Amino acid sequence: MLQVYLVRHGETLWNAARRIQGQSDSPLTEIGIRQAHLVAQRVRNQGITHIISSDLGRTQQTAKIIADACGLTMVTDPRLRELNMGVLENRPIDSLTPEEEQWRKQMVNGTEGARIPEGESMTELGRRMHAALDSCLELPAGSKPLLVSHGMALGCLLSTLLGLPAHAERRLRLRNCSLSRVDYQESPWLASGWVIESAGDTAHLDMPALDELQR
């Protein structure tokens, strides 16, 4: 049975400032760096064989810390990027106009066909996240990969694995450097395919985390 660990990146400057990130970027805060070290210590003896990260800076910074702890080299996969938030990227949440806030609400509430101008739909996000996860099936037998990605991206992936709509990710709280695990099982008596073993585990973090204020 293939086990795949999923980690959200550490807290960033824009998380703390309530600024929309999407596929724009900001570095980890000191808290975010500590979170990354803590999750690295959590997984370092789990037999991880591959560290695969979104190619955005905040995930690479997190993944590098984990890779160093595991004695591995990190590789990147752009399919693990966060949702493209289009014209709202790099905007403080409190600065959105009523029209822009309506775009955001339609997106997160699952309005059919919702998309922020110049951005990406939740359906498109789910499709590429599933493709990134499925590519783990091509790794050598005995592999145990760890993927480093983003809050909405991982929430969308986990929601849709359960057969829920992509926007159900609103109902999953995946805090910075939380740890999730999905397994691929083939069984004549259990559901075959991807199953969720755990989601949003923060037992390794030793400090209160910011809530996902931008969400």
UniProtKB/Swiss-Prot annotation:
InterPro entries cross-referenced by the UniProt entry: His_Pase_superF_clade-1, His_PPase_superfam, PG/BPGM_mutase_AS, PGM_Phosphatase, Phosphoglycerate_mutase_GpmB
Per UniProt, the keywords (alphabetical) are: Glycolysis, Isomerase
Q: Which GO terms describe its cellular component?
A: cytoplasm
Q: Which Gene3D superfamilies match?
A: Phosphoglycerate mutase-like
Where in the sequence is the active site? H9 (tele-phosphohistidine intermediate), E82 (proton donor/acceptor)
Give the highest taxon in the source lineage: Bacteria
- Its EC number is 5.4.2.-
Per its record, how is this protein called by name? Probable phosphoglycerate mutase GpmB
Provide the gene name from the record. Answer: gpmB
